[in-house]
Amino acid sequence: MLANLDRYKIVLASNSPRRKELMTGLGVDYVVKTLPDVDESYPDTLQGEEIPLFIAREKAAAYQSMIGPEELLITADTIVWHEGKALGKPVGRQDAIEMLRSLSGKSHQVITGVCVTTREWQKCFAAVTDVRFAILDEDEIAYYVDHYQPMDKAGSYGVQEWIGFVGVESISGSYFNVMGLPIQKLYRELKQL
């Protein structure tokens, strides 16, 4: 379907198993390249969409010297935006519990910034999905944190895991964005190249 990409070798710069799963589902051939320590810090003045876009651009810049002449690099970053602040990946069990408590019974946004980069050009975009959580009790939060893998996920949850089944009341926007990559929007962007 994306014959226009035949001239490129697609490189996904991500350790995320969910992003790999989504790229595989898109049906394009790609390889994964990762660097050990890409800086994911950002200026405190950034808000909402600006944060994951900034980090996606920084990730692309970190890989710039590795991009071959026929390569198309995809970088992404996802945050949970809640009550005026970004929730990234938790730093430990207690941090994960506190994040989930703060999301319980409330709405938040999941925002992913994506950059598609070659040696000659770069195109970046953001996707925003509104998510509403049901009220979660302490046992549900502890069960999820102790039995699943919240530590590698923005906001301490994976919508495709148990917490998504029992805790997510509604989603407005891309479900796949909540997983970490707005694959439909990425497909549309790639189709226009």
Curated annotation (Swiss-Prot):
Its EC number is 3.6.1.9. GO terms for cellular component: cytoplasm. The keyword NAD does not apply. GO terms for biological process: nucleotide metabolic process. Belongs to the Maf family. YhdE subfamily. The record marks R18, T78, Q160 as: Important for substrate specificity. It is found in: Cytoplasm. Its cofactor is a divalent metal cation. This is dTTP/UTP pyrophosphatase. The active site is at D77 (proton acceptor). One of its GO terms (molecular function) is UTP diphosphatase activity. It catalyses: dTTP + H2O = dTMP + diphosphate + H(+); UTP + H2O = UMP + diphosphate + H(+). Nucleoside triphosphate pyrophosphatase that hydrolyzes dTTP and UTP. May have a dual role in cell division arrest and in preventing the incorporation of modified nucleotides into cellular nucleic acids. It comes from the Bacteria. It comes from Bacteroides fragilis (strain YCH46). The lineage of its organism: Bacteria, Pseudomonadati, Bacteroidota, Bacteroidia, Bacteroidales. Keywords: Cytoplasm, Hydrolase, Nucleotide metabolism.
